[in-house]
Amino acid sequence: VALKDPAIDMDLKLNTNDIGFKEILSLIPAIYATEFSSLKTDGTATLTATAKGILQGDTVPAFNIDMQVKNAMFRYPALLAGVDQINISANVQNPGGNIDLTTVNINPFSFRLAGNPFSLTATVKTPISDPDFKAEAKGVLNLGMIKQVYPLGDIELNGTIDADMQMSGRLSSIEKEEYERIQASGTIGLTG
């Protein structure tokens, strides 16, 4: 890292060895603040990141961030169930220059909540000016089961989301109610 007032010229690399999934969960305030010491976890995660170039004003260096979570799980011992088979492959990259050139890819983010599998894939481009997205979701989420895997206190959740859908388009099309410009297929069912 070189300070070239008013810019910063950087050439950074980060590569973690396998780290425990509990260390990743500790970064999520809602989980860390709720009986974190008793939380049982398994699975590993890796993180690699690079950044090379100039950071000045609206100009960003080229960067690439990869996160992998493999076969992870968490469970609060006082609760009936847990979340397992957690797998995440995520990448955020930018060729440098404009932050709006950033691309986010998540393929997959999958898990099993109290025995029900759910998976999501997503890609987002031009996240600042007009997010261009493509997403796919498949699985069943029984919202009432969340209380069995996470201590919600007095909060009650009910209902089921059953999804097998794909969607792509731009946020501006939704904001302008130009729904014909959004590509969508599949089904999503909401009950309860």
Question: How would you label these PLM feature ranges?
Answer:
Residues 1-109, 116-192:
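Membrane-proximal interfacial segments on either side of biological membranes
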